[in-house]
Design a protein with these regions (language model features):
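Terminal domain-start segments
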Residues: 1-78
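Sequence contexts marking disulfide-bonded cysteines in secreted/extracellular proteins
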Residues: 11-13, 90-92, 111-113, 220-222, ...
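Short, surface-exposed coil-to-beta transition loops
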Residues: 65, 108-109, 115-119, 156-159, ...
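Acidic/hydrophobic-patterned starts of short beta strands in beta-sheet-rich repeat architectures
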Residues: 77-88, 96-109, 166-176
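Mid-length scaffold segments of soluble, non-membrane domains
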Residues: 91-99, 103-137
Length: 256
């Protein structure tokens, strides 16, 4: 997500919704590398959070606490609420960075001094213990042919999973970001910002799935100033053939 100041438009500031706070406190210490006592103190402090229309009886929520953010996804059964957590899960000691890894963050407490921020998916069991269901619930990144991967590298493209629209709806987006240049990107280019589409990741009420296209309701534009062109701000300006105006979407994933 964007830096904290830009994280959530129209967000509230206060203590996190109880189920988000309970999840963050209950995460196994061996997962998150931050002592439970530290987390118990932190969730009592002011944080930014926002309700998002979802598919359950209660709204989804997104909240941020320092370098940690969490997004809940509701379904028909509140007992199966799913949480996407972005946190310092991989301690630098023993974790190998890759070409798309951001710099590690320094931890405020615990025995791990620095860790890489990753995303994991959790559900809370009947015993109150969060279970890591990432491998089951989150589809792998879309496959990229070796020729396309070589083309990305030649143009200094970076594969990114965009979480920024989770403050509005149920979708994330895989794309390739190229440096600012007049050079045209590949056949799946979109927007005015040197980007190439790979796939969306969409919550469907029970899990996440890859989709080639979504509706505008699933991928809303950021608000713009009064009088400005709708969908005219960063990062929404420019053509985007993968966001449809209608209500029907194609679940097939394109091959970049």
């Amino acid at each position: 997500l964007a830096p904290q100041g830009d994280l959530m438009i129209g967000a509230c500031q206060g203590t996190l919704p109880p189920h988000l706070a309970a999840l963050l406190v209950a995460l196994p210490e061996q997962d998150i590398h931050l002592p439970r006592g530290w987390r118990e103190r932190e969730v009592r402090q002011k944080a930014w959070f926002k309700a998002v229309a979802g598919m359950g009886q209660r709204p989804d929520f997104i909240g941020r606490l320092g370098d940690i953010w969490v997004r809940s996804f509701e379904g028909a059964d509140a007992s199966t609420t799913t949480y996407l957590v972005s946190a310092p899960f991989d301690c630098v000691d023993g974790a190998l960075p890759n070409e798309n890894t951001a710099e590690p963050v320094r931890l405020a407490a615990g025995s791990c001094e620095q860790a890489y921020v990753r995303q994991r998916v959790y559900q809370v069991g009947s015993d109150g213990v969060p279970q890591d269901i990432t491998a089951m619930a989150m589809p792998a990144a879309p496959s990229i042919a070796e020729a396309d991967r070589a083309r990305h590298r030649a143009r200094e493209g970076k594969v990114i999973l965009d979480h920024s629209k989770l403050q509005y709806g149920p979708a994330m987006r895989w794309f390739v970001q190229y440096p600012e240049s007049p050079q045209k990107t590949g056949p799946h280019s979109f927007s005015d910002w040197n980007r190439e589409h790979l796939s969306f990741v969409v919550w469907n009420g029970t899990g996440f799935e890859l989709r080639d296209t979504v509706t505008r309701a699933q991928w809303p534009c950021d608000p713009v100033a009064p009088g400005d062109k709708p969908c005219g701000g960063f990062p929404d300006s420019g053509p985007d053939a993968y966001v449809l105006a209608g209500s029907t979407v194609n679940s097939a994933v394109s091959s970049p």
